[in-house]
Amino acid sequence: MRFPAKIVWLVLWTVCVAEDCKEPPPRKETEILSGSWTEQTYQEGTQATYKCRPGYRTLGSIVMMCRGGKWVSLHPSRICRKKPCAHPGDTPFGSFHLAEGTQFEYGAKVVYTCDEGYQMVGEMNFRECDTNGWTNDIPICEVVKCLPVTEPENGKIFSDALEPDQEYTYGQVVQFECNSGYMLDGPKQIHCSAGGVWSAETPKCVEIFCKTPVILNGQAVLPKATYKANERVQYRCAAGFEYGQRGDTICTKSGWTPAPTCIEITCDPPRIPNGVYRPELSKYRGQDKITYECKKGFFPEIRGTDATCTRDGWVPVPRCAWKPCSYPVIKHGRLYYSYRGYFPARVNQQFVYSCDHHFVPPSQRSWDHLTCTAEGWSPEEPCLRQCIFNYLENGHTPYREEKYLQGETVRVRCYEGYSLQNDQNTMTCTESGWSPPPRCIRVKTCSKSNIRIENGFLSESTFTYPLNKQTEYKCKPGYVTADGKTSGLITCLKNGWSAQPVCIKSCDRPVFEKARVKSDGTWFRLNDRLDYECVDGYENRDGRTTGSIVCGQDGWSDKAACYERECSIPEMDPYLNAYPRKETYKVGDVLKFSCSQGRIMVGADSVQCYHFGWSPKLPTCKVKKVKSCALPPELPNGKRKEIHKEEYAHNEVVEYACNPRFLMKGSHKIQCVDGEWTALPVCIEEERTCGNIPDLDHGDVKPSVPPYHHGDSVEFSCREAFTMIGPRFITCISGEWTQPPQCIATDELRKCKGSTLFPPEGRQAHKIEYDHNTNKSYQCRGKSEHKHSICINGEWDPKVDCNEEAKIQLCPPPPQVPNACDMTTTVNYQDGEKISILCKENYLIQDAEEIVCKDGRWQSIPRCIEKIGCSQPPQIDHGTISSSSSAEERREIHEQRLYAHGTKLSYTCEEGFEISENNVIICHMGKWSSPPQCVGLPCGLPPYVQNGVVSHKKDRYQYGEEVTYDCDEGFGTDGPASIRCLGGEWSRPQDCISTNCVNLPTFEDAVLTDREKDFYRSGEQVAFKCLSYYQLDGSNTIQCIKSKWIGRPACRDVSCGNPPQVENAIIHNQKSKYQSEERARYECIGNYDLFGEMEVVCLNGTWTEPPQCKDSQGKCGPPPPIDNGDITSLLQSVYPPGMIVEYRCQAYYELRGNKNVVCRNGEWSQLPKCLEACVISEETMRKHHIQLRWKHDKKIYSKTEDTIEFMCQHGYRQLTPKHTFRATCREGKVVYPRCG
């Protein structure tokens, strides 16, 4: 409890004792005590003064006094406040904000930021308020800049820059544009952004292309993956849709223009007066159908009650019309009564009718009813012809009379040798009676006696033949028809036999004995010549190797036979022995020689009999010592194989080899014969090279570089686990590789069976199997030497055999082939050796080029035949023979008219044509090889036609092909709208020029019937009407034809003056001038009656005949009939004066004149006329390849001035102008358009 006691004591001491103050206390952080205060205490009343820290200020002094041991503030309200700063200052293109503090006073900090597109210069972006004001300078904002922009390749730039390589400031814009045929890949313009970089990368100018357009409810025709600029694509819309603007679109830099769209076809509900339809919808889509029904008394204008919604509206137009039946004209019949007052008749109304003699109604009654139906009168043909069959001239007549209706047929039987007309056996009842008539006429026949076949005969036994009968004729043995057959056919026709049969002399292909012929014919005509050639070693009877036979009347002129040639014993040296000795020797026989009395033989030790005799030359026997030879000669392009010596003995042989790429012709061995060397071979360059190295399964070839020339070799190797069978190297020999080896899997190699000739190995040798590559030696009985054999994939090489080997037969020295290069040698050759033969210049080798030593004699002996030149080369269309020789040389060659064997000529084609194959022909043994052809270059896509559409279906067109094009609406051509592919280029198309017409012409006395338009399409017509008192003289229309107005309406003044004066008559409402067809009425005065028409009519400026007023009591009889018309009232026998009767025409006939006639003075006034209707028949339309556009009846009746619309049948196009397909019926005649 010591601590509490100390506190109490301290308090008491403070109250009672202390009055001084300690050191003045610190007041605030903003104030600093002035002076030095080092004492421990300070007396009562001492004052301490404070001043403000830097950055602060106050009004007056801040003083504290020591009172009662405490420091007390004398002015408590006085404090140090932060020193203020002025406005920090604005910077252009920037702003600032207080980052520290709430006002501009000591310690405040403002931070500047630049506006977008501007950046601050320097690193200091702030100012602080300190004791001396604002620190730092006001920051500066400068505009942001972007690097210069370079023009894109195939493009250019547009900007407001003064210089092309200057920097751009913030906000500046650069626009890009590509050259023609290119489009931008990237933005069209870029701007310098606030970050100092461009808003996007510089675009590229890429070649304009478009992908196949994707068309909603449509598709492109013949689409491709991509299209180039200005390429055009045609497209078609799906069913129920139509083109938005046009049926094609063009690839542009903006894409497909115009955009290909397919708009749905819609139709509004149809308006059908006097009819109803279903289904009833507010809107119909394309191909939607409606079915309509007409009210009672009305009928569809055309057959059928369906209409379809199309782009042209409802087709056909649904209409209900009143269709009564007019007075019927019955062909070959009449109505029982006049009934004139009952027409036109109502539907279902019936009338009794009867038919003329030989005609009956379809019911075959004597009379029947004609009924008015919605489709017209029924039956359609009221009267049909009735044919009676009761007699057949020259034929079998029926037992009883038989009746047939028009259209029915009957089969008849004529007597033998007779027939109906045209060899028919049926008659048909027609409107004119029987066809053909019932009369059998004698049938035309052909007789054997009417024909004589030289060297042939008719094979059938029949003597006479009916019309159109075919029969066979045969030729005698040794004769054939013109086409080489033994028989032919002839036909009996109206004028006799079809043709004179011919049997010509022929010879069958002969049997050749030891001869060959090039012809493949199986038969030959009279005087035909057949050349043949004997095989080697044979000759014909004349001792020649070639011959010919001729086909004559008695067959071939000779037998094509060749006989084996023979050689006789030649004249020899008297000391020369020959064996074997025979009288004659056959081709191939060998004669060997030896000398007697120890003489030395000089030359070949053997000769062979050939088709040209013995060869080589026979040897001689010499007494003296034979001479040796000096060094053998050098071989051009070759070398000797032996080591060089100074001297070579008689009969010593030296071998040669040709350098690489050279081929040896002749013997590769020469021999020293009595001091002279035999003939050297020749090394000629082999131009033929070998193709690709053959593939080796499971093997590889060591790298080598083509081309591979004659003599080049390549090496093969097998892969691991495979073993090579055969030589490692293959060699190129005359353009062909030698046989390559095989690589066989090592574990699949076959083993070789042992042989009894092998030494014993503990068990029977022939039961032992040996692996591949095993080498075995064996010894034949009675022989001291050992033989060796190796196992090669299951076969011993050489074959294990102890049979006595046949002595190898040597061939005599090779022959000297006639017309071949000198190859004289005396060296014998072993079996299998070959020698290549080289013919002399201007000679050509025939058959094999090499002779082969086989079985001790030379075989495959060729011939050297003389080269035959050729005459003038063949000419080709659109091509000529090109030649590098001078004009003089070409003229000399042309004058000679002969080209040497082997001559090569090349052809060149005219411009626009190319060679179809090799352009070179070669003269070979008097004949030229087949010449090439010059074919027209094909063309690519047809060219673009401005304001037109080219119809193309493929990407490539052959020479001469033609393509048509259509000009856009409002455009046309002055010539044919087609182009042709000519030598790789299209002919120039006709321009599609505007065919619209403007500036409608004006006429003095005529005005337009409709409002005038800005322009009119070609083919469009404009109608005019004449002013009052004028009448149109001709057509009232003019037509726009290819931008020109054609036609002129001519208005003629057809008014009339005062009507003619009539005695005893007055004129009602008389005027001084009357319009055409205006009437003036007369009235008789007093007791006078009017005779004639009471009215006169102004017609084309002239009044009709006026009436007369005279006294009469005359009455009229029945009104006279008119063609194709009748009166509307019941017919009476007597009519009082002044009685009016009305006339009406039949359906589709038009009434001309006054329909009312008046009885005056016992006579009827002028009768009207019924103008004939137009009948449109199916036959006429078929000939013109047209059809009705809206109707499908076989016959349509149209009134005068009615318009009939036609269209082309499917697959045909218009041949006449478009306006002709809207024809007008004019008084029974209509002009038909044509399609083709």
UniProtKB/Swiss-Prot annotation:
Expressed in which tissues: CFH is one of the most abundant complement components in blood where the liver is the major source of CFH protein in vivo. in addition, CFH is secreted by additional cell types including monocytes, fibroblasts, or endothelial cells.
Molecular function in Gene Ontology: complement component C3b binding
Keyword RNA-binding among record annotations: no
PTM statement from Swiss-Prot or TrEMBL: Sulfated on tyrosine residues.
Keywords for the protein's UniProt record, in alphabetical order: Complement alternate pathway, Disulfide bond, Glycoprotein, Immunity, Innate immunity, Repeat, Secreted, Signal, Sulfation, Sushi
GO cellular component, one term: extracellular space
Domain of life of the organism encoding this protein: Eukaryota
Disulphide bridges: C21-C66, C52-C80, C85-C129, C114-C141, C146-C192, C178-C205, C210-C251, C237-C262, C267-C309, C294-C320, C325-C372, C355-C383, C387-C429, C414-C440, C446-C492, C475-C503, C507-C551, C534-C562, C567-C609, C595-C621, C629-C672, C658-C683, C690-C732, C718-C743, C752-C791, C780-C802, C811-C853, C839-C864, C870-C923, C909-C934, C939-C981, C967-C992, C997-C1040, C1026-C1051, C1056-C1098, C1084-C1109, C1116-C1159, C1145-C1170, C1174-C1225, C1208-C1235
Residues with Sulfotyrosine modification: Y168, Y170, Y465, Y473, Y575, Y579, Y585
Domain Sushi positions: 19-82, 83-143, 144-207, 208-264, 265-322, 325-383, 385-442, 444-505, 507-562, 565-623, 627-685, 688-745, 750-804, 809-866, 868-936, 937-994, 995-1053, 1054-1111, 1114-1172, 1173-1235
Gene3D superfamilies: Complement Module, domain 1
Biological-process GO terms, alphabetical: complement activation; complement activation, alternative pathway
InterPro entries with a match to the protein in the record: ComplSys_Reg/VirEntry_Med (IPR051503), Sushi/SCR/CCP_sf (IPR035976), Sushi_SCR_CCP_dom (IPR000436)
Entry function: Glycoprotein that plays an essential role in maintaining a well-balanced immune response by modulating complement activation. Acts as a soluble inhibitor of complement, where its binding to self markers such as glycan structures prevents complement activation and amplification on cell surfaces. Accelerates the decay of the complement alternative pathway (AP) C3 convertase C3bBb, thus preventing local formation of more C3b, the central player of the complement amplification loop. As a cofactor of the serine protease factor I, CFH also regulates proteolytic degradation of already-deposited C3b.
Name of protein: Complement factor H
Organism: Bos taurus
